[in-house]
A protein has these predicted regions:
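Acidic (Asp/Glu)-rich catalytic clusters
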Residues: 221, 259-267, 285-303, 356-357, ...
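C-terminal active-site subregion of NodB/CE4 polysaccharide deacetylases
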Residues: 178-246, 252-253, 313-403
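Charged helix-capping and loop-helix junction motifs
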Residues: 283-289, 318-322
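Bacterial signal peptide processing site
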Residues: 20-22
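Short, well-structured secondary-structure segments
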Residues: 189-192, 226-230, 244-245, 263, ...
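Bacterial N-terminal signal peptides that target proteins for export
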Residues: 1-7
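C-terminal motif of bacterial Sec signal peptides marking the signal peptidase cleavage site
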Residues: 15-18
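Primary recognition of N-terminal secretory signal peptides and signal-anchoring hydrophobic helices
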Residues: 24-38, 46-191
Length: 403
């Protein structure tokens, strides 16, 4: 190998010597090493490492019951602290139908309720009412996940009804008419119907033809009448000619025939459901249908007792069961606590009405004619609209509406 390298070197020298007079001399630049620029790090100030103060663990809170506020299930439910049920302010306030909720940096969570402003600030144990602090018997809890308020005491201040359903571990918070005041001396024709169909069964007179039903509602709308529900009684002054359409039993045709007519004319009605029949009788509405109608804002689902007995023949215990069971069932279906009872067959006695008043705010008879608002709200009369009721007879029933 070494001999081959020497021979090759010799041959190269001879070639260069022979061509030296004809070739330009090539000068290769000297090999240079790459320059290395030394960069010194800039002088920096390293911040001192600070250890954040240890965060004290928050007191453990036990999960509470499901809470439904005016039909809305609160996502966080409730918690228990020292035996008191709490809900999150930023979930509870917005769920209330009649309130206006907002959050302000200066005021915190704010609810405008019946003309009064309530607000809750972080780390502030009281409830601020129109700028004045009200100290609650249970403190407001400021936690990393939000501000929690004692729901029972708050509902008491806002006149919101609480209905406990232990078997379903649910608490219903509903703004109902138990503490409302309303204008007296207002004439309200309250019309009693049952079914709306041409496929009659049983007592034919109970079923109004859909075409007649539409004709009657169209007359009301075109002649300046206001169809209202009991939820509207808190502001009766807004209605010049109030009329109430009520339907007993909760038949399927109330959804299939009546509801589309109400939607067409933007009219309101109240349906009194026999709660044991919901979802179990092919002729009565389902829970889903009742929920849809109630949440449309056009229909109010209320109670017609649990299984439609003659209340005057019930024992005291049976009366309590009829009132409570139907109340719980309607709340489970709609998310709202019902506050009106319609007496089956129009049959009630003093005991039935007194016990009914423990659970409801209004009680309706079957017949009796025109109602004028007063303090007597547990024997409210109605006009009976039958299948053979003519339009002229219907007009006579509603003609006196107003003041």
């Amino acid at each position: 190998m070494r001999c081959k390298r020497i021979a090759a070197l010799g041959l190269a020298c001879l070639m260069l010597a022979g061509c030296g007079s004809h070739a330009e001399e090539t000068t290769l630049p000297p090999e240079t090493a790459p320059s290395i620029v030394e960069t010194l790090p800039a002088e920096t100030t390293v911040p001192e490492t600070t250890v954040p103060p240890a965060t004290e663990p928050e007191p453990a809170l036990e999960a509470g019951v499901t809470v439904v506020a005016d039909g809305d299930v609160l996502e966080s439910g409730s918690v228990l602290f020292e035996g008191i049920t709490y809900v999150k302010a930023d979930e509870f306030f917005p769920a209330l139908d009649e309130g206006e909720y907002a959050f302000y940096e200066t005021k915190g969570h704010t609810l405008l309720w019946k003309g009064v402003e309530y607000s809750i600030l972080p780390d502030h144990e009281g409830l601020i009412r129109d700028g004045k602090t009200m100290i609650l018997s249970a403190p407001v809890l400021t936690r990393r996940d939000g501000i929690w308020i004692p729901v029972e005491e708050l509902c008491g201040m806002l006149d919101i009804s609480l209905l406990s359903d232990p078997s379903k571990e649910t608490l219903y918070c509903t703004a109902i008419a138990s503490d409302w005041s309303w204008e007296t001396g207002v004439r309200i024709p309250i019309l009693m119907y049952h079914g709306v169909t041409d496929n009659v069964w049983g007592a034919e007179e109970l079923f109004v033809s859909p075409s007649d039903m539409e004709e009657q509602i169209k007359y009301l709308v075109e002649n300046g009448y206001d169809t209202i529900t009991f939820e509207d009684w808190s502001h009766l002054e807004d209605f010049d000619k109030p009329v109430m359409l009520t339907f007993d039993d909760g038949y399927l045709d109330n959804y299939e025939e009546l509801f589309p007519i109400l939607q067409k004319y933007n009219a309101k009605a109240t349906i009194f459901a026999i709660t044991v029949s919901v979802d179990k009788d092919e002729r009565t509405m389902t829970s889903e249908q009742a929920w849809e109608m109630h949440h449309s804002g056009l229909v109010s689902i209320q109670s017609h007792t649990y299984n439609h007995p003659h209340l005057s023949k019930c024992t005291e215990e049976e009366l309590h069961n009829q009132m409570l069971w139907s109340k719980l069932h309607v709340a489970r279906i709609t998310g709202y606590e019902p506050f009106v009872i319609c007496y089956p067959y129009g049959d009630s006695d003093a005991e039935a009405r007194d016990i009914g008043a423990e659970y409801y705010s209004f009680g309706l008879n079957m017949t009796g004619g025109l109602y004028t608002t007063s303090t007597n709200v547990f024997q409210i009369p109605r006009y009976y609209v039958a299948r053979n009721t003519s339009l002229s007879a219907f007009i006579d029933m509603v003609d006196e509406a107003g003041r």
